[in-house]
Regions:
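Canonical phosphoinositide-binding patch of PH/PH-like domains
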Residues: 107-131
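Phosphoinositide-binding peripheral membrane targeting modules
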Residues: 42-116
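Mixed-charge, glycine-accented linear interaction segment located at domain edges/termini
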Residues: 128-143
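Anionic N-terminal interaction surfaces
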Residues: 1-60
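Low-complexity, intrinsically disordered/propeptide-like segments
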Residues: 25, 85, 103, 132-135
């Protein structure tokens, strides 16, 4: 279904401006029109509390020399700068050849939030993307 939405309506495609910005950052990987699931567990922020919730979407994932970006529909839902110290606390794994799992603690990116957020992306070559994340250049590597 996600491929159909992508091909017919462009849902899950990065905006042109974002694509140009990513190209300038040294785009290592880009997958558009992919299925993704976002899951919140024991999530709290302000007055909102979620014990467990999942949301499916069509989106895109990109990895550059500077950041990891995930879009759901046409909105950015995850934008992690590789220079951010919290990036080292993000768990990226490949539970099967076509699934990429990105798990993080909400508090690492928002001091007013708590709980766990997991993104599951159905992307061809997920293992290669997970490997790129593991081998990314960290700020300490530059010095």
């Amino acid at each position: 279904m996600s491929r159909l939405l992508y091909r017919l309506f462009g849902i899950g495609r990065l905006p042109r401006r974002e694509r140009l910005r990513l190209a300038g950052e040294g785009l290592a990987c880009l997958a558009e029109g992919i299925s993704l699931t976002i899951a919140w567990r024991d999530f709290r922020r302000g007055g909102r509390r979620v014990k467990a919730h999942q949301q499916n979407a069509t989106g895109a994932v990109a990895l550059t020399r500077e950041r990891l970006l995930v879009y759901a529909s046409s909105k950015p839902v995850l934008d992690i700068g590789l220079a951010d110290p919290a990036a080292d606390r993000v768990t990226v794994s490949c539970p099967n050849p076509n699934t990429l799992s990105i798990r993080l603690q909400a508090r690492d990116f928002d001091p007013y939030a708590s709980g766990q957020i997991t993104y599951w992306l159905l992307v061809p070559g997920a293992a290669a993307l997970a490997d790129l994340w593991q081998r990314r250049e960290r700020p300490a590597d530059k010095g």
